[in-house]
Amino acid sequence: MNLHEYQAKQLFAEFGLPVPEGYACDTPQEAFEAAGRITTEKKVVKCQVHAGGRGKAGGVELHDTKDGVKEFAQKWLGKNLVTYQTDANGQPVTKILVEEASNIANELYLGAVVDRATRKIVFMASTEGGVEIEKVAEETPELIHKAAIDPLVGPQAYQGRELAFKLGLEGDQIKQFVKIFMGLGTMFSQYDLALLEINPLVITGEGNLLCLDGKINIDSNALYRQPKLREMHDPSQEDEREAHAAQWELNYVALDGNVGCMVNGAGLAMGTMDIVNLHGGKPANFLDVGGGATKERVAEAFKIILSDDNVKAVLVNIFGGIVRCDMIAEGIIGAVKEVGVTVPVVVRLEGTNADLGREVLANSDVDIIAAESLTDAAQKVVAAAEAK
């Protein structure tokens, strides 16, 4: 689950990190009043969406009047912001962040992720702030400095000092950086984060450090024990189909192809997408129905897949391990009837009672294309999609 910039900064402030004075606003009038509370001559106004590239898309502006801030809010609130990280429809803007402008002398980068290879939280710092860290890692990896946090002992001050020295910080800046580093390390573990970034972490004209931007991603598997963070969830930033799927405990990701995929198991789902690609097709989605492929969940999965007008055929690929294939076949038949599926449906069953499952499909009054193998299924569904 992603957080907005203003939410990330709220958490930063909670852990004693320096952030600009700012206010998240729902209306143009609120933005106008917020600008009046900020004492700096210039104010920064930012659209709050779960996507990067806001500045280049016109979603971040500098204003020196309250009326200018209000006009910006009137322009964007209720509209969609399209950036290089969004689709053509963009992301809806429901909040505007109004904050004090900062006197920037230098820009740094500071971020942290879970390194699954070492099973540690790894902090990354660089003097190349304000640009995509992926680009820095590709072109000048020597400019990225790392510190691995042992989960048994947590972040240590000496690690923060080492990073500060490598960034060329001096004097009181080192103490400030260590405080930021320690706060972020504690926050990462306490809130079950998967990723956090401060890009840029700036050095102001007065020589102080300031968290000018914030990006936080929370491990969705841990949200059950993070009620405070759950309340920060903004469903408007999610694909409607993905949000609907989550309600049924279906793992769905929308793609831009024309072959709908319904599979049980994430690994099998990825393999299914690969083989569809291999045979010239383009998957329209990733959808894992999980181990409990009941009639109800299969029906909802069909509804979600078919809500995409680009879908011309559906491939159902089920491995019967926990559940029996004959039961799954009956669920598929019932779901196809209930939903009123009008596109070709190719079904491949393997595992427990697979032969019986195929027999159930063959004896049904529903027009379903049976496949003997995964390759056969991919070839048939690609051909069916091309024929539509």
Curated annotation (Swiss-Prot):
Give the EC number(s) under which this enzyme is classified.
6.2.1.5
The kind of enzyme this is, by top-level EC class, is ligase
* GO cellular component entries: cytosol; succinate-CoA ligase complex
Which one of the record's GO molecular function terms can you name? Answer: succinate-CoA ligase (GDP-forming) activity
Cite the binding residues for substrate: N264, G321, I322, V323
Source domain of life: Bacteria
Listed under catalytic activity are: succinate + ATP + CoA = succinyl-CoA + ADP + phosphate; GTP + succinate + CoA = succinyl-CoA + GDP + phosphate
Keyword annotations for this protein?
ATP-binding, Ligase, Magnesium, Metal-binding, Nucleotide-binding, Tricarboxylic acid cycle
Query: Do you know which InterPro entries this protein is assigned to?
Result: ATP-grasp (IPR011761), ATP-grasp_succ-CoA_synth-type (IPR013650), ATP_grasp_subdomain_1 (IPR013815), Succ-CoA_synthase_bsu_CS (IPR017866), SUCC_ACL_C (IPR005811), Succ_CoA_ligase-like_bsu (IPR005809), Succinyl-CoA_synth-like (IPR016102)
GO BP terms: namely:
succinyl-CoA metabolic process; tricarboxylic acid cycle
Q: Where is the ATP-grasp domain?
A: 9-244
| Record has Transferase as a keyword | no
Listed binding positions for ATP are K46, G53, R54, G55, E99, S102, E107
Which cofactors must be present for this protein to function? Mg(2+)
UniProt entry tagged with the keyword Nuclease: no
Cofactor: record remark: Binds 1 Mg(2+) ion per subunit.
| Pathway in which the depicted protein is active | Carbohydrate metabolism; tricarboxylic acid cycle; succinate from succinyl-CoA (ligase route): step 1/1
Q: Where is Mg(2+) bound in this sequence?
A: N199, D213
The record describes its quaternary structure and partners as: Heterotetramer of two alpha and two beta subunits.
Family note: Belongs to the succinate/malate CoA ligase beta subunit family.
* PANTHER family named in the record: SUCCINATE--COA LIGASE [GDP-FORMING] SUBUNIT BETA, MITOCHONDRIAL, SUCCINYL-COA SYNTHETASE BETA CHAIN
Its biological function?
Succinyl-CoA synthetase functions in the citric acid cycle (TCA), coupling the hydrolysis of succinyl-CoA to the synthesis of either ATP or GTP and thus represents the only step of substrate-level phosphorylation in the TCA. The beta subunit provides nucleotide specificity of the enzyme and binds the substrate succinate, while the binding sites for coenzyme A and phosphate are found in the alpha subunit.
- Recorded protein name is Succinate--CoA ligase [ADP-forming] subunit beta
Source organism: Vibrio campbellii (strain ATCC BAA-1116)
